Amino acid sequence: MLRWSRRIGLTLGALAFAAAQASAQAVLSPEQMRDLAGQAVLQGQAGLAYDLTGALIERDETDLDAHLIRSRAARNLGRNDEALTHARRAWALAEGENARYAAALAMAQALSSSGRRTAAQLWLRRAVQIAPDDGLKARAAEDFRYVRRQNPWSTALRFSIAPSSNINNGSRNETSELFGLPFEFALEGEARALSGVEISTGLSTRYRLVNSERKRTDLLFGASHRTYVLSDEAKDIAPDAEGSDFATSSVFIGLQEDYALPGGRSRLGWDARLGHTWYGGEPLLSYTRLGTNYRRATGPNGMLSFSVSREGQSGEGTRDDATIWSAHLGYGMSLASGNTVTVSTSFIQSESDADYLDYTQRAISARYGLAKPIGPAQLEFGLSLSEKIHDRANLTTDGRDERSLQATVTAALPEMDFYGFIPTVTLNAERTHANIDLYETENFGIQLGIRSAF
């Protein structure tokens, strides 16, 4: 915190001047008092700076620099409420980019010292937005990361809009052979792929209960909702369907904990969650999930991760119960060029009396991110392959076998930064081949989203 405080002090605009040569004068001028107060607060003489700025503010209540210095001095003296009062006054007086930037940092510093770190993060985002140059912008972003690490609360908001050729995961075919019969059945309505627009929102938050070098314990909460708007073509195919028929909502609470292992390069953790899911506005299932995870730093730029979990699903209404075991192994690293590469593999086994919930699934995926932008875009490419096998299927005696291929290209647009948030555009193409025509699908879409730049 001391390192960050010193950095904040250095940005409070023209505060570090040479000490006034007051010994030759009986009375210091306001400018000399201001200079001396700025030098005093940087040299750890908060009491002197506090007294000098008090006299300056008594002389001229609109003295911006005096309020900035007094806010810093009051904070160093532990008078956090007073520090916040003078930071607010400085913000009200500030005009121009440099002054507003300095006042925003003073507000963030005072709020953080008062324990209001989430509010401090908002003010640091404001400082990023109004920073006069890239260097000061980067400094405010670094300070944001520091405060975020100290904040027990961490909240992420998600929002995206995604036009899609297949919002309901319907078949790309118009007919399908069923039950082993030597002729095809026409697929109608919701059995076929319906195009439209997906609208997705979500919130996840974490409160850190314990934060030590050895252990971290977090309380978790999350909520999400995804709904759709059908295209005119989809309404012609399925006139009785509405986009909300395919909407999904979910909430969960959880607890997670991880421990630093000897050597300082590995962490071992566990997590538990309780959740509920709705589909089409109706309850679909409740679940309990228990998992464990392991992470290890490999060299200066690599990270290996492994996780295993068990989820017990209790179906609502006519939906059957299921038990789902899953395992995930991944490795990510930064290359010498600054580009990033991530590879992973996963295995899922779902056990249920219902054939559509009883399956095994294997997948491999890779992602590659470019360090240098191409034009205005920071690009990341993704590719995944998966196989899903149902030993039993009510439409055939041969079971059900699906193989899927998905490719994505995501473009982040950092030049359109707004308060530290940047827009993203993701192009998605996915196709599934199956031994049953009904389950052959394809989906082409574009997703517009927002993410934090730091």
Predicted feature residues:
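Low-complexity, intrinsically disordered short peptide segments enriched in small/polar/basic residues
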Residues: S5, A24, G54, A66, ...
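Hydrophobic alpha-helical targeting segments used for export or membrane insertion
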Residues: L10-A22, F454
